[in-house]
Structures are given as C-alpha cells and as structure tokens.
Swiss-Prot record:
It is found in: Lysosome membrane. SUPFAM superfamilies: Winged helix' DNA-binding domain (SSF46785). This is Lysosomal cholesterol signaling protein. GO terms for biological process: cellular response to amino acid starvation; cellular response to cholesterol; cognition; intracellular signal transduction; negative regulation of BMP signaling pathway; positive regulation of TORC1 signaling; transmembrane transport. It is a multi-pass membrane protein. Pfam families: DEP, Mem_trans.
C-alpha cells in the first residue's frame, strides 16, 4: 500500500510530543468520513473479557474451583450455552445480506495457513510423532476463539456502525470445524493406528472416525439444525422457545471466559527444548500470518460495489485473524493424548499476546488516511496511558518479590533489576510527556533517563537468559552476578553517553526516538540484535544439560531440585522413583523428635536404636513409641525445619516462568528490531509499518503487564492469604451457630473416614524416618507425597481436590506440619501424623492442644467399622 507518510515523522518506539488539543486528539480522522468502527468501546470490551479470564485464573490458582469441578462448567458452556446461542442466531440469520465473497476469502486464507503448517510439519517433524503434529498444529494455527473472546470485541467495535458484521462470526466459525478440522483428526487417527499397530483398522475406518468426531461436535450439529429451521420458521423463533434460548445463550459469554481462565492454570510446565521454537512459529502463524492472509484475500477477492464497505471488510478480516487460539484445540489434544504440552501452553500464551495486537490493530484501522500528525498523537496518547497502568503493575510485582524475599536468590535477583528498569522506562515516558519542546536541558535529562533504562530492558532480556543457562550449570560454572548487574546498567548508560558526546542533535525532531537521528537508530538496532542473539543462544544451550528435558513448572507439585543437593535433606535417591526418598532406612529411631520443647528448652529422650532392616523394605515408624512428641519442632534446631526454610527461599527458582518471560520479551525485541531495520532501509514504510510502531510502543511501555502476569500473582503471598481471609469473613457469619463445634461436620466425616479406612495404609506407603537431629529421627512425609497418594487411592480426582482433602486433615487434627507454621501445601514441606491416643500424652503448652482435642473428639465419635470407601 502506498503511503505519503514521511519516514522522519515515524518512531521506533513512541512519538514524544506535547499534549494535543482536545479537538484534535479525539478526532484522528483527517476526513469527514464516518468511522468504520467504534474504537471508544474497544478498551472497555478488552478489560471486560480479560478481566473475567483473570478472575477464572485466580479462582483456579487459589483452588477455589478444582480442575475436576471446572469440567462441569466446561460441559455446560460447550453442550448447552453455546449450542443454544448458535441455534437462535442461525435461525434469525438473514442470508440475503451475507457477503459470500468474504466467507470464501476467509476459507481460502485459513486453508492456506492450514496446509502450509501441515506440509512443513510433515517435512521437519520426527517420524515417531509426525502425524499427530501434522494434525494438531494446523488446527492450532487456524481455529480462533470466535465466540467467547471474538464476539464481544466485534460487538463493541461494529455494533453501531456495521451490525451485520456480527453474524459473520456464526458463519466463519464452522469453516474450521467442518472443513479443516476433519483433516487434522484423520492425521491424529493415523498416528493412533501407527502407535497401536492395529492392522484391523483400515483407511476407511480412520477417515470415518475423523468425520464422526466432527459430527459429534455440538457446534457443528446445531449449525446444521439452525440453518434448517431458518427456512422452516422463516427466520422467526417462537416466543417461548426464544426466551428459553436467550436464558441459555446469555449465560455463555461470562461463563466461557471464566472457564477459559480456569483452563489456563498449570498449563505451562515441563516445556521441552523443541517446544520453544515450535511455540514461537505456531503463535506467529496464528497471530501474524493468518491475519495478513485474511486481509489480503478479502482485498483480492471481494468485489463489492462500495469502496468504504470493501475497506471495512478487509480490516474486519484482519481483526478476525488476530483472535487467539480456541480452548477447543487443547481439548482435542487431550482427547488424543498428543502434543498436550505444546498446545495448552500455546493457547495460554496466544491469548495474552493477542490482547495488545487486537488493541493496536483496531486502533489503526480507524485511520482512513496516513496523515503523520494524528498518528504521532495517537502513539503519544497510547504510550502515556499504558505507562501509567504498567507502572502500577510493576510496583505491585516488585513488592511481591521484596515481600517474598525472592530478590535475594537467583534468578529473581536479576529479574528484580529488569523490573526496576521497566519501571524507570514508564516513569521516563510520563515525564517526557510534560517536558516543554523548547526546554533543551530538560529534554536531554529525560532522554538520558528514558533511553538508558529502555536499552537496559533490552539488554536484561539477554542477560537474564544467559543467567538461566549458567544456573543450570552452576555446579560447574560460577555465576558472575556482579558482572551481569554492572553490564545490565553500565552498558546502556555508556551507549547513551556516547550518543550525547558524538551524536548530532536533531533540532527539528521532538521525538525521543529521533533525538540523535540515524546514529541513534543504529545504536538501538545493534543493542536489540545483541540481546536477541544472547537470549536465543542461551535458551538453546540450556538444553545441553543433563536435566534439560524439562523445566520446573508453574505447578508447585512438580519435583524440585535444591541448589546444593549434597548438603541438604532433599537428596535424591539413586533408585528411579517418582519422588526423592529423604533420609530413609536404617536411622536410629527415637521416642521423640530431638528438637521437641520441654519446659521451654530443647531436650532429647533416650535413644532406642532399631535393628537394621533390609534396604528393600521401608522403615515404618512406631507411633506408639512417639506418644510424647506433641510439641512442635523448633525451626532453629530441627534439620527438617531448616531444610524447609532453605527450600522456600531458594528451592523454587521458577525456571519456567523466567523462560516464558524471556520468550515473550524476545518477541517484543524482534518487533523493535524489525521496526528499526524497516525504517533504515525503506523511506516509505506504509500502514503496516505504522502498526508495527504501535505494537512497539505497547510493548516498550507495557512490559509491566507481562511481568505482572508472571510474577504479580504469587500463590502463597497473595492468592491463598486472600482466600483464607475471605473464608474467615464468610465463616464469621455462622460463628454463633458453630460456637460449640470445634470442627465442621464435613471435616469431621472426612477425618473419620480417613482414620478408619486409610490411615494405616497411608503410613505404610508414604511416612519415612527422616533425620531431624544429630542422632535422632522422626516419622514424617511430604505434602506432595500425600497429594499423590490421595489421587492414587481414589480419595481425590486431581491435585486441587487432594490439597482440599489434606487441609481438612490438618484442621481435624489428623496431621500437622512439623513446626505448625504452614497450612497444608502441595510442596516439599514436612508433615507428621498425630498419635492415635492423644489422651495418653502429656498436655501440650502451645497451639497443638486445640488440634489434639479435635483429634480426640473425632476418634471418640467415630462409628464402628464400616466397609471401606475410596
């Protein structure tokens, strides 16, 4: 597309200008043409959609709704709410107003992306999983979240200008489901046939299974039924049926977005080395290649009479292509049990990456011309607004790192520096907005602050990636933390200083990105290239270590490795077991943990060594001998308590979160580098370049959103305490009724069942003797071990429900944390069973007394033996 926009008036990151008068700022159109969309409603729509998604994610992370419970909501959304919504809209759809050229343009664009991804996957994928990838990856790249996320945004943009565009959502969505997805399903069925070597399954049966999966989809089924009733009922739904359908359909949007947030919990984990490149390529195909192809196909094939409508349709096609991946793709991957990690992780990443792209795209599509002044002021306003919100997010994220004391450990120490640099960038942008154009000294000072911190954010991406690589090899390589920190702040300051000394100030430009002209552009490009190169090489080299096959995930239930395994209680057993056995087998057993409190002083009862047992048989602690261990351990003297503290401070390195942070930042660095090179080698960049400018502005001053999403919602510091506070306030309403009952009936029944039917088996399976003093040991177990055991025996269907079950055992006095400082967690924290006969024990002086009384009440109120229930 030709453009009259002078290159010197464009920016690499943002146009820094004085505040524009209101009449101009709010009227970007340079002509009197009516706007093609209502941009003022876009931001509230995005906040509404992603706010509900965030609520669902928080509910899942706080275990308010477990993954098993979420399946019920998902079934309601997919089998009741969405089919009802589809049926009604297909019945009332006016097919005479449909632009069919638009539909087959979208079909051609989707089919092109589908077959490109499919062919490339077949060519480069490994033979053992070639067909599963060739089936699911093209579906990932073409199936959009049309109804839950797409429809509210299209409604906000086009409800007042082109309301007929809303009906295209219901017509475009079945294209993927009915025409493209069957091909992917057939490839997946071929992969299943190859894996099982079932010779009886012929080709016709494979194709039939693929088509059957399509027909079983409620969306496809209701589309056909709706079209049939469109002609039968003459596009009029009976009143009583309409009210019923409206009741179901109106519940779709909120529940679908909430369910989308629930499905994101714990999806990004154990990313393998091949997943990084695959994720970037798939997300690029979905969010960049597909929108461009959709737009170009509509431009090429749509032969509408109205030029305005033609342009609006092509813009709408581009916006449609930016919609993120549908959650249904993750469901397909789970059903086939193929490529689940890549598909689910990609769904989460694409959903959040699509938000700024949709915002930028919709904003740019409101400009009928390429007049540089409105574009400059638009970027200015967007950058200023984003900086304010981003700075608040960064302050919150920094507070989380400081309060959790993670800033003292690697790699969070370096992440803290990155967040500080991002905060200075936002503050610098806000200050620049108020600097007078003729105030040269003020401009120089703010320029130094802004660009030294902006270059620092670029470099910290590469430095953080190389620190992650060194962290994987820290047993052989000493991490030069001081050098990394000095480089992260010193090199950007040096570059800006060189620009100030040697560069020629461009007096005609009020834009900070062109303050020193071409020299500044080259400096920015070199900085970006070096950071991308360092980050890319470091992330690839991380896979050369022995444990590079997987990284620690978001889910705290995954196995953790402590920094120095040779000096900790968390030593891994050489046997190939799921969890490390910690100080098991022949250790002298004592009648009590050595760090028990007696009259305020530490004491150790007499040691009664036990006979050596075979290494093949675990030592089962004698709880009858441990009757006197009723006081909590002292964290200053107990080895187990000390190791817990070490684990909490340094064991959770959150490597996957940091790798994800680096990947998202690299995408933004690529965009900035492309913008630099595009400007340097093309004097008439065009509209696409301006969109890239907007994206760069959103990225540079909106990095705080990425950091907040990854580090701002700490589970144990924010979510769980907030959840417990709400539960406390809620339960206070019933205090008068429950004053005479130490524990609720639900907790009491859970504890009764566990004591009579499962306690002894659980002790034999997971409780081990672990050293807690110089010559003493205690029978304990890890919280994550109990969670896995509860799932194994059928007392819980997932880890979320198992945590709830374990928390009830703690409240009922059945188990207890060794120091009584933590609630039940799915982590490597040590817990112990309280003795069966608390009345035989001496009274405790501390908070354990209440738990012992609760346990005694449960034990004495337990019914006689019943048939076990699992």
């Amino acid at each position: 597309m030709n453009s009259n926009l002078p290159a010197e008036n464009l920016t690499i990151a943002v146009n820094m200008t004085k505040t524009l008068p209101t009449a101009v700022t709010h009227g970007f159109n340079s002509t009197n043409d009516p706007p093609s969309m209502s941009i003022t409603r876009l931001f509230p729509a995005l906040l509404e959609c992603f706010g509900i998604v965030l609520c669902g994610y928080i509910a899942g992370r706080a275990n308010v709704i477990t993954s098993t419970q979420a399946k019920g909501l998902g079934n309601f959304v997919s089998r009741f709410a969405l089919p009802a919504l589809l049926f009604k809209n297909m019945v009332v759809l006016n097919f005479s107003n449909v632009d069919w050229s638009f539909l087959y343009s979208i079909l051609i664009a989707k089919a092109s992306v589908f077959f490109i991804v499919c062919v490339l996957t077949l060519l480069v994928a490994s033979p053992d999983s070639r067909f599963s990838k060739a089936g699911l990856f093209p579906i990932f790249a073409t199936q959009s979240n049309d109804f839950a996320l797409g429809y509210p945004i299209v409604e906000a943009l086009y409800q007042t200008t082109y309301p007929e565009y809303l009906q295209y959502i219901y017509l475009v969505a079945p294209i993927s489901l009915m025409m493209l997805n069957p091909i992917g399903f057939i490839f997946c069925e071929i992969q299943k046939w190859k894996d099982t070597q079932n010779a009886s399954q012929n080709k016709i049966k494979i194709v039939g299974l693929g088509l059957l999966r399509v027909l079983q989809n409620p969306i496809v089924f209701m589309v056909f039924i709706g079209i049939a009733f469109n002609f039968i009922l003459d596009r009029k739904v009976p009143v009583y049926v309409e009210n019923f359908l409206d009741g179901l359909g109106n519940s779709f949007s909120g529940s679908a977005l909430f369910y989308l947030g629930l499905t994101m919990v714990g999806k990004i984990k154990r990313l393998k080395k091949s997943a990084f490149v695959v994720l970037i390529l798939l997300i690029t195909a979905k969010l960049l290649v597909l929108p461009l192809l959709c737009r170009e196909m509509v431009e090429l094939l749509d032969k509408g009479d109205s030029v305005v409508n033609h342009t609006s349709l092509s813009n709408y096609a581009f916006l449609y292509g930016v919609f993120p991946v549908a959650p249904g793709v993750a469901i397909f991957a789970t059903q086939f049990n193929m490529e689940v990690e890549i598909i689910t992780s990609g769904m989460v990443i694409s959903t959040f990456v699509s938000a700024p792209i949709m915002y930028v795209s919709a904003w740019l599509l409101t400009f009928p011309t390429m007049d540089p002044k409105p574009l400059a002021y638009a970027i200015q306003n967007v950058s200023f607004d984003i900086s304010i919100v981003s700075l608040i997010s960064l302050i919150w994220s920094l507070a989380i790192l400081l309060l959790s004391k993670k800033y003292k450990q690697l790699p969070h120490m370096l992440t803290t520096n990155l967040l500080i640099a991002q905060s200075i960038v936002c503050a610098g942008m806000m200050i620049w907005n108020f600097v007078k154009e003729k105030n040269f000294v003020g401009q120089i000072l703010v320029f130094v602050l802004l660009y030294s911190s902006l270059y620092s954010t670029y470099l910290w991406t590469g430095l953080l990636a190389i620190s992650l690589f060194l962290l994987k090899k820290r047993e052989r390589v000493q991490i030069p933390v001081g050098i990394i920190i000095i480089s992260g702040w010193g090199i950007p300051a040096l570059l800006v200083g060189v620009l100030l000394i040697t560069g020629k100030h461009n007096g005609d430009s009020i834009d900070s990105a062109f303050f020193y002209g071409k020299e500044q552009m080259i400096t920015t490009a070199v900085t970006l290239f070096c950071s991308i190169l360092i980050a890319g090489i470091s992330l690839m080299c991380m896979n050369q270590t022995a444990q590079a096959g997987s990284y620690e995930g978001f889910d705290q239930s995954q196995s953790h490795k402590v920094v120095e395994p040779g000096n900790t209680a968390f030593e891994e057993s050489p046997a190939p077991v799921n969890e490390p056995e910690l100080f098991t087998s022949s250790i002298p057993e004592t009648s009590c943990c050595s760090c028990s409190m007696g009259n305020g002083e530490l004491h150790c009862p007499s040691i009664e060594p036990i006979a050596n047992t075979s290494t093949s048989e675990p030592v089962i602690p004698s709880f009858e001998k441990n009757n006197h261990c009723v006081s909590r351990c002292n964290s200053q003297s107990c080895i187990l308590a000390q190791e817990e503290e070490q684990y909490l401070q340094s064991g959770d390195q959150q490597l996957t979160r940091h790798v994800l942070l680096c990947l998202l930042l690299i995408i933004g660095l690529f965009a900035n580098l492309s913008s630099c090179l595009w400007w340097l080698f093309n004097q008439e960049p065009g509209r696409l370049y301006v969109e890239l400018q907007f994206f760069c502005a959103v990225f540079n001053f909106g990095q705080g959103f990425i950091s907040f999403g990854i580090f701002g919602l700490d589970k144990h510091l924010i979510i769980l305490p907030f959840k417990r506070r709400l539960e406390f306030l809620w339960n206070n309403k019933d205090t008068a009724e429950n004053r005479d009952s130490p524990v609720s009936e639900e907790i009491k029944m859970t504890c009764q069942q566990f004591i009579h039917y499962h306690r002894d088996l659980c002790i034999r399976n997971i409780v081990k003797e672990r050293r807690c003093g110089a010559k003493t040991s205690a029978g304990t177990f890890c919280g994550c071990d109990l969670v896995s055991w509860l799932i194994e025996v059928g007392l819980a269907s997932d880890r979320g429900e198992a945590v709830i079950y374990g928390d009830r055992l703690v409240q009922g006095g059945v188990i207890q944390h060794i120091t009584n400082e933590y609630e039940f967690r799915d982590e490597y924290l040590f817990y112990r069973f309280l003795q069966k006969s608390p009345e035989q024990s001496p009274p405790a002086i501390n908070a354990n007394t209440l738990q012992q009384e609760r346990y005694k009440e449960i034990e004495h109120s337990s019914p006689p033996s019943h048939s076990p229930k699992t």
